[in-house]
Amino acid sequence: MNPARRVFVHGFPGLYGGAGTELHHQILAWLAMGIEVHLIPNNPGYEQEPLYPEMLSRGVAVHRCNGWEVLEPGDPVLAFCSAEFLACLPEIRRHTRRTVFLNCMTWLFETERRCMANGEIAMFLYQNETVRLNHMRELRRLNDDPAIRFLTFKPYFDPERFTFHSRRETEFFGCGRISRQDADKYSRNTLHIYEYFVAPKFKRAVFLGYDHRAEAKIGRPYDWIRTARDQNEFSQQEFYKHCEIVLQPTDTTENWPRVGFEAMASGSVLIVDNRGGWQQMVDHGRTGWLCNHERDFIYYASKMAYEPNLRADMAEAAKRRAIELGGLDASKSSWEEVFDEIAKLPE
């Protein structure tokens, strides 16, 4: 078998959180392409993962935790934003030199820098061209070997798991924000923004991905804001069904936020920071709103609350935008190019 027609991944897909969710959707694209998919978990509890039954039913081969003995020369091994993968590279490269690292962040891991200097990563993959150029510039200073490749791909997003809500008949105006539990995912003025935007109905918000770290940063949410630690307390589907808008000021610069696709597929209009991957994902004024200041967040949230017809039009446009950016055909074509390049890497 051509080694590029099968792929090994270090890690396990998930239903919540950036890298795990990203991996899940890409596995679906690879299977649709006829790629043979193998998972080498990095956690011994992988059999308890929610997606374990689905992976087996789809024909994905799941090996033992860190079971590198299954690798043959020429097998590509990918990892999505995994520090554990970087730490294992010396051992992995005793079996295959086709090591591929996908950094989901806008910054570099220190271990990633070291691995680049040592020539342990054969290919770097990115979802965002701007991030690729920035990272490549920094990494090339550490190792100018032209055989090390830097590519972008078009990530697949599976919209079937999210229901599009064209109309929400409730007595309140639903809003919220969603992320993993990380204080940096919250802007310090989050509560100020939620308090001061106005709506013709009572506001009700959900903060999904909230714990003591967020509270230490932004303060205790108002009584009309429900908080949930993760999807086990409040699922993504429940969240988007609730939210007319996703009002999400953060202190981070996002790379290619999966929650953007989820919101667009669900009919929740995005009101987000005017930086990072949001600038490529959101068509300002047509599919969502890009904000430079807390006043922008307050204004656009109020506008969406008082103009339901405009909000509905933007939600429909955003749904089409999600298909344009993350559709299966475009993603498959992109991944074909990536696998063709992987097949050219030294074995």
Predicted regions and their residues:
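Conserved acidic donor-binding segment of nucleotide-sugar-dependent glycosyltransferases
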Residues: 284-295, 303-308
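A charged, aromatic-enriched C-terminal amphipathic alpha-helix characteristic of glycosyltransferases
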Residues: 18, 295, 306-346
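A short, glycine/small-residue-rich beta-strand->loop->alpha-helix junction that serves as a flexible
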Residues: 11-24, 183-185
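A short alpha->beta transition loop at the rim of the catalytic pocket in nucleotide-sugar-dependent
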Residues: 244, 267
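Conserved catalytic-core segment of nucleotide-activated headgroup transferases in glycan assembly
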Residues: 133, 156-234
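Short hydrophobic beta-strand element within catalytic cores of glycosyltransferases
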Residues: 269-272
